[in-house]
Amino acid sequence: YIGSQYEKRRSAGWSDSRGGFGSSHSDYEGAVIAGNTFDFPAVHGESLMAAGYSFVSTSVKAVEQGVAKLEGYKVLDIIAGKQKETKVGYGAYPSKYKLLSSALIQAVENATKTGANVLLTGAYVASDVFDHQSPNAEEVAFAKNVMGYAWGGSQASCTGEVYTIPTAVKQIPGYTDIKYNNELNSKVYCVESPNSIFASDKLGMPFMRYTENNRNAGIVSRREGYRTAVLGFPFETIVSREVRDLLMKQILDFFASEK
């Protein structure tokens, strides 16, 4: 990637002095652009440890195959990043990278029945479930009934700025300004299209909004026997380490409280 495409007319011819169809800007030529560095459990783990918690990590595949058991843990931190269902070629092969598989849904739901609280963060946590011509009923039921969230729209922000708001959840007092990365750079991947989400029932409430338009960026929910928190952008893209630590501690304090 060297820059955004500016010539989209197929009829535009190419010459040495004039770029034709497919020509793009060169403002990123030679620049190092961060992608998936596969070390985000460590980024989340830093904030978990700063809040006084220990942690272990596992792959989704290990959970789906039953190798890693989720029962017995107090908190599940699901790192969704920018994962979403992606078509392969012209559709001759099955799509890949869907966020929620049936096996993962069952594993997380079983864990919540033993009291596990769940934190889910990612740019497509809602749109990958709801934004389909025929949404999968199992996925929708999991999002709404187990996690307590629903889709409020895509392309929720272009500034990368959110803020927490005062709610009935005393552990998250509000008035914290948060910046997540929305620009290509060499340190952490760019979030171009975060989700807006809202609580699916009266057990939950929004606690975070996108600064530019006040759309919901995150919800918390008191479920039956456990609690959840969902963000419409990836936690690991929050620019400030101090803010990541603060937000993680507030969410964990909410999980641990009885009110």
Give, region by region, the residue ranges found by the protein language model.
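Aromatic-Pro/Gly-enriched surface loop or interdomain linker
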Residues: 1-75, 79, 235, 249-259
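Structural recognition of the beta-strand scaffold that forms the well-ordered cores
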Residues: 1-3, 56-57, 74-80, 84, ...
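A short acidic/glycine-rich loop-to-helix N-cap element
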Residues: 235-247
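Alpha-helical scaffolding within the catalytic cores
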Residues: 61-67, 102-106, 213-218
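Solvent-exposed loop/turn segments at secondary-structure junctions
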Residues: 5-8, 62-64, 81-86, 118, ...
